[in-house]
Amino acid sequence: MSALHSRVIFVCLIFITGGVILSLELIASRILAPFFGVTLFIWTAILSVTLIFLALGYQFGGWMTLKVEEKHNESLLLSLPILSALFIFLSCLAYPIILPALSGTSLIVGSFVGSFVLLAFPLIFLSAANPILISLLRQSTNSKDSGAGF
């Protein structure tokens, strides 16, 4: 595979993971709305949880690129969306049980815990893909100074 072809594929994968992350945020707002309303607190909770767990996912992905051998990066990259889909499925099963119980708590605590339940693990695994993609791009171009930028 040529370097340009692999670069286009990697950029498309990064674009798709970003789109899925944005979709999860919007879906979380619609799921939380019946329990906590559509308020500034809900959006604050969703955006705060998103930023925290994106940062943790980037850290986790960078750590995985250092700990896992380079030849296993592709299989690791393929396993991350599967893990994310599994946790999205589990949060779909958990939210009808957890969110009604949280609706009796304060708006701030309930919205943050609800956002955590819905978003934490899928965001970690989706955002961990970006450092691994950058590592794979560096491997395909045989240049240690390429990757994140254009």
Where are these regions (language model features)?
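Alpha-helical transmembrane segments of multi-pass membrane proteins
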Residues: 1-150
